Amino acid sequence: MKKKVIRIILTSVLLLIAWLIDRNYNLPMWQTLIVYFVPYLLISYDVLGEAVEGIMEGNPFDEDLLMSIATIGAFIIGFLPNGEPEFLEGVFVMLFFQIGELFEHYAEDKTRDSISNLMDIRPDSANVIKKGEIIVTNPANVAIGETILVKPGEKIPLDGEIIEGNSSLNTVALTGESIPKDVTLGDNVVSGCVNISGLLKIKVSKTFNNSTASIILQLVEEASENKSKNESFIRRFAHIYTPIVVIAAIILAFIPPFFADSYNDALSTWLYRALTFLIVSCPCALVISIPLSFFCGIGGAGHIGILIKGGNYMEALARAKTIVFDKTGTLTRGVFEVEAIHPNQFSEQELLHLAAHVEQFSTHPIAIALRNAYKDTGCECKVENIKEFAGQGISAEINGKNVCVGNKKFMEHIGAEIVACSKCQHSKGTSVHVAIDGKYVGHIVIADQIKTDASSAIANLKKIGIEKTVMLTGDRKEVADVIANKLGIDEYYSELMPADKVEHVERLLHQKPIKSTLAFVGDGINDAPVLARADIGIAMGALGSDAAIEAANVVLMDDKPSKIAKSIAISRRTISIARQNAVFAIGIKVAVLILSTVGIATMGMAVFADVGVMVLAVLNATRALRVK
């Protein structure tokens, strides 16, 4: 770039000298040509070389050829009958073209630097502990199972498990979330997070290339390969358009003079118009700015933890009118908690005490919820003869009494009559019943908790024009009904098996509005068939999950459903910017093309319509990078 700046400055000085010589000395035409040809050759040798190279490779029709023909033609016009020398304009056009190229490359480089800074999540070194010593090395050299030390202020270089220490992590580079995440012994951590406070020893679980930060960066880099329809069309259009423009310019130069009184007298006039036509016809503003718009949009989204795998998926997301949610892990936290305790003859703590002790060895999510809720007071109970009844519950002997914990079917099986509870009529949870020696003593309500921003997420989707929201769940109808009504979801389908969810998505695909798309939102782990079948698959909570990143077209790195509306808004804004560039570039070019055909537009106006429009379009494209 520095070389080009020096060439532009030197050419400007030589052009000024050439103009002063031309103005003050009445030189013969060929001497004037030499005076102007020196700065022309200095500023255009690379463009001329690219044009020749394109011809040799069988791909001649690009902006280099158009500029070469136009500027060389400007030098030739002066030697035609009644032709006015256009040496100054020939050099000026190429000079301005190179200035435009300089601005374009500068804007593109700044954009790429901005995206690189936004996605600066991969550290360059790792502190490996070997034989009691700390060795600083490249993260790519660290093997699975080795121990690394991460000091406060450092980025975690590799995924792994904390084996010593506790701290708070800044995950903003991965998720866009500014609130620190507390971690301690036994927690899994991912690369790219910044260690804020404590000293951490981490046992590496993934190689550098397979760690989260590397996968995310690879995903962003590969996104440019998945072209949108607009990008693909523009590239095909340029290949067809440029040869047509060259043919049209040839016709414009040589056919109209036949209708003049003197062909030779009119040729120079129409040749000038044709050369102006060639300059303004260059499609570089479209070819450069539209892909750059998508590139910036994808980079900006990545900064706040929304990974869109390409311009084609961005276009599909922008046209979404139907959003289908899996319930667990998407609208709800996917973590069961004790919501209520309804004893018949014991205290709440005593009932919970019995249930937690019976379930103490179970790995079922409900058992874990009971144990988490129970505050052990140090009471020692003798728990014996634990028996599990598949799909029903568990029984055990506690201090000589038979305690059964399970569902309604289990109570019927042991002959315990359930006492109706008016408090549970509108509960969204699952009732865990408890009986002692065959007598019903109460129940505990376990519920999956709705995410704090789920309600606002649905409301925001409706605000941006989503016409239908649907929830699919394997849970009971009563639970699904409560959640759907609370969140304002339009339709819900409950008690579904995985295959049923695919069938429902198939049906909804046939019902969606014409030219719109259907997006399915899931956790990306158990929903792979549905994610694949939807027009656009969105995986939530994918931080540290390779399966989620692989399965979806759009990946939300945290658990916030509110980012679904944000991802759609970013996609729509990006496409709007790309369309603005297309309309602006085509509009200006068409206007100047018409003016050049009728002889009003000069080469200077043509250069602005080409290079000036390109620079403005590139600057406009960079707006897609700024995501609020």
List each model region and its residues:
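P-type ATPase nucleotide-binding
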Residues: 151, 338, 342-468, 477, ...
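N-terminal membrane topogenic signal
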Residues: 1-10, 241
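Bilayer-spanning, highly hydrophobic alpha-helical transmembrane segments
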Residues: 12-13, 232-261, 273-294, 579-608
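Short, hydrophobic transmembrane alpha-helix segments
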Residues: 18-32
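Conserved catalytic phosphorylation-site environment of P-type ATPases
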Residues: 63-68, 174, 272, 282-358, ...
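Actuator/coupling domain of P-type ATPases
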Residues: 19-22, 36-125, 129, 141-148, ...
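Conserved ATP-binding TGD loop and adjacent catalytic N/P-domain core of P-type ATPases
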Residues: 400, 430, 436-580, 588
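Juxtamembrane helix-loop transition segments at the membrane interface in multi-pass membrane proteins
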Residues: 52-61, 103-117, 292-311, 622-628
